[in-house]
């Protein structure tokens, strides 16, 4: 009886299935696929332009006040190409697909999934809202509810929202929340799996991931103040006093005295100081950090894109979150659309031994195998762009 050979399409579909099943953070974010590169192939540096929702001011009275469109766009850059190499022989192609997947694909694909998740987790550097106490592992419902509070004050859509935490936070939350008014099936999952599971405190899922990032804060120490009053709508830089050649790291979060966050729908103060995140590392020089790049951009309540109730004033105290030069885990609570993961088709090369590309649930994956005649090998690479 003749053996049937596994085809490259079968292998690619199975590899994509294994990849999806091993993703954690990436599975719960907005996944976009762009087929515009399907013919010529995408390259690192290619961009996708994403339109953000329009915002406008509500006016009172019978007189019409026409406003210009406040259309905003953000650019998503194809910034990395992930691949993993594997060798499989013609003899291994005679195996059953599940056996082949278990022996050849799963060990490598799981590492590819972890690397992709780590890239997505690195988006914390663009997130300006933070709750909890740096250095204290979450172990109560309060930190999850405070995270939900931040999302609500920012007018984020209620569902679907997710949390992805590191192993330490997962252990703390499962221990701290066990049996507290939880449905029987939730308690059962916690006991059997050691995971929080689904449908917890308004979150679709609370997942554990080993890809959650550790953030090392800048070396900034001592007191800091704003050096120059901000007066321009949409300004996304700020000047802060600094010492010597100390640093502020990308991902550092800070507040400014008397600058409060506003609800984007009502444009009224939430009563909480607006948090800002540094988007690019900055080194002090001449007693100041100059043009520190921040997010969100500063718009007052008079603007349709309002983020704060008033402009930061000169000499206002700046308070950084966490101690200087210290590592803190960056657990995430987010709405699905807060983070986008986009893939594009890689070019299918001609004249190789095997090549296939498959797309499923917003992920495009390519598998290529070629003969290495010099070393009598058949190297194969699995790529995601």
Could you say what each language-model-derived stretch is?
Residues 50, 76-143, 152-169, 193-208, ...:
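Long, contiguous amphipathic alpha-helices that act as assembly "spine/axial" helices in icosahedral shell
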């Amino acid at each position: 009886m003749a053996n049937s050979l596994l085809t490259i399409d079968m292998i690619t579909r199975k590899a994509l299935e294994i990849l999806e099943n091993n993703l954690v953070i990436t599975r719960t974010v907005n996944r976009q696929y762009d087929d515009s590169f399907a013919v010529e192939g995408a390259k690192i540096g290619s961009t996708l332009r994403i339109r953000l929702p329009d915002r406008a001011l509500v006016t009172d009275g019978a007189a019409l006040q026409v406003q210009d469109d406040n259309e905003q766009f953000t650019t998503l850059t194809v910034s990395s190409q992930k691949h993993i190499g594997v060798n499989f022989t013609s003899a291994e192609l005679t195996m059953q697909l599940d056996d082949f997947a278990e022996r050849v694909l799963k060990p490598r694909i799981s590492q590819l999934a972890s690397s992709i998740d780590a890239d997505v987790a690195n988006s914390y550097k663009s997130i300006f809202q933070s709750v909890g106490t740096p250095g204290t592992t979450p172990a109560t419902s309060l930190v999850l509810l405070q995270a939900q509070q931040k999302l609500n004050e920012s007018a984020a859509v209620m569902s679907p929202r997710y949390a992805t935490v590191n192993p330490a936070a997962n252990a703390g939350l499962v221990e701290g929340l066990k049996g507290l008014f939880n449905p029987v099936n939730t308690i059962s999952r916690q006991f059997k799996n050691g995971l929080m599971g689904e449908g917890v405190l308004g979150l679709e899922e609370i997942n554990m991931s080993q890809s959650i990032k550790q953030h090392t804060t800048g070396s900034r120490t001592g007191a800091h103040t704003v050096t120059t009053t901000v007066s321009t709508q949409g300004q996304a830089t700020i000047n802060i006093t600094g010492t010597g050649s100390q640093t502020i790291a990308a991902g550092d979060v800070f507040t400014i005295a008397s600058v409060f966050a506003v609800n984007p729908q009502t444009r009224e103060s939430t009563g909480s100081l607006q948090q800002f995140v540094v988007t690019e590392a900055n080194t002090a020089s001449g007693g100041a950090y100059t043009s520190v790049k921040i997010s969100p951009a500063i718009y007052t309540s008079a603007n349709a894109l309002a983020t704060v109730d008033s402009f930061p004033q000169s000499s206002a105290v700046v308070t950084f979150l966490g101690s200087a030069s210290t590592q803190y885990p960056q657990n995430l609570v987010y709405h699905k659309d807060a983070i986008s993961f986009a893939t594009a088709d890689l070019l299918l090369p001609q004249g190789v031994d095997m090549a296939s590309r498959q797309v499923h649930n917003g992920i495009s994956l390519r598998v290529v195998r070629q003969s290495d005649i010099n070393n009598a090998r058949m190297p194969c690479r699995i790529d995601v762009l």
